[in-house]
Amino acid sequence: MIVYLFPTEMEAKAFRRLCPDAEVIISGVGMVATAAAIASLDRRKHLVASDMVVLAGIAGAYGEGVAVGDVVEVVSERCVDLPERFRQSYLQRVFHTKLRRVASNTIHAMGVEAEGAEIENMEGAALFAMSEVIGFRAVEVRAISNRVGESFDKWHLDEATAALAEALKRINDGE
């Protein structure tokens, strides 16, 4: 079983058009909403090791290493909003796509430093944490919509969500 988890309907819309039969869940934005959505999914479906939950959405890029419109697989996440001694990192040991692999920060506050990450998002660490607890396969796919710190009116949402949908279709088709 593959379930596609999106923080918002806006991020899911183009994928729903390309893959209308795919199982899509809108989790809500942030780590708490994502963890709750996965817990609810597990309660209903009893996730097992062969099940895959694909968290997909937009992300911001630090610096110039990843271009706006690029689609990447996140292979490590750090919770950087917490005080240093409580920060948790998650590392993906099995890769599920042919996409470029990047490190990410999961954040909820402005002004967080990259510290080795190439992108940032608001949900990824929750996916990896829940995967460790429950035991399903976790895949995080992000399309770059903006540079970190850019004002929202400069984000390339249509371009990013279209690229995301195409990449997810390839995953859904087994490519």
What are these regions (language model features)?
Residues F6-E175:
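Glycine-rich phosphate- or other oxyanion-binding loops that anchor nucleotides, phosphorylated ligands
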Residues M1-V3:
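Extreme N-terminal starter segment of soluble prokaryotic enzymes
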